[in-house]
């Protein structure tokens, strides 16, 4: 694939598996939802080759930021998702959100991203769709508030 990440067909399986495993061990599951801001405009004005290059760089930055046990997925178009097991929301923000924004800024000075973070509690049951939807909603809050930002429940 273009980005070297799993595609959306793997997402539901990854989240469901992570939730089941985490529930047995009383660990949290965190979803990070990432969107490349103004991607359509970039594609339309700078061309699809530039758009593909941006997607490859973002995919690479996501893989570099993730741990071995994390699932990195290209959700579609310019949207990505990382599923983290046993990673608290604050830790996800410090380790992933800030690092990812910084890495993308270093490689793509003219591109910004918006990130949403959602987490289940250690003993809380949430289905996969609800967790992803919440991370997506928080990504839109980050996008409206300030581009190149992340939104967690505590921010």
Task: Go through each PLM region and give its residues.
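PAS and PAS-like sensory/regulatory domains
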Residues: 109-114
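Conserved long alpha-helical elements within nucleotide-processing catalytic cores of c-di-GMP signaling
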Residues: 4-30, 37-64, 73-77, 81-82, ...
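Catalytic-core segments of nucleotide cyclases and related cyclic-nucleotide turnover enzymes
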Residues: 48, 97-101, 105, 120-155
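Short beta-strand-to-loop capping motifs
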Residues: 82-87, 119-120
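Short conserved AdoMet
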Residues: 67
């Amino acid at each position: 694939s273009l980005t070297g990440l799993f595609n959306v067909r793997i997402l539901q399986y990854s989240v469901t598996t992570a939730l089941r495993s985490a529930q047995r061990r009383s660990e949290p599951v965190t979803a990070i939802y990432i969107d490349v801001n103004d991607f359509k405009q970039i594609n339309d004005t700078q061309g699809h080759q530039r758009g593909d290059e941006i997607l490859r760089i973002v995919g690479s930055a996501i893989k570099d930021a993730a741990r071995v046990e994390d699932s990195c997925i290209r959700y579609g178009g310019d949207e990505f998702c990382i599923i983290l097991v046993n990673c608290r929301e604050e830790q996800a923000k410090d380790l992933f959100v800030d690092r990812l924004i910084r890495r993308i800024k270093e490689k793509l000075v003219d591109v910004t991203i918006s990130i949403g973070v959602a987490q289940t509690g250690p003993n809380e049951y949430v289905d996969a769709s609800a967790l992803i939807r919440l991370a997506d909603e928080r990504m839109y809050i980050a996008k409206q508030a300030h581009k190149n930002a992340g939104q967690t429940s505590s921010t």
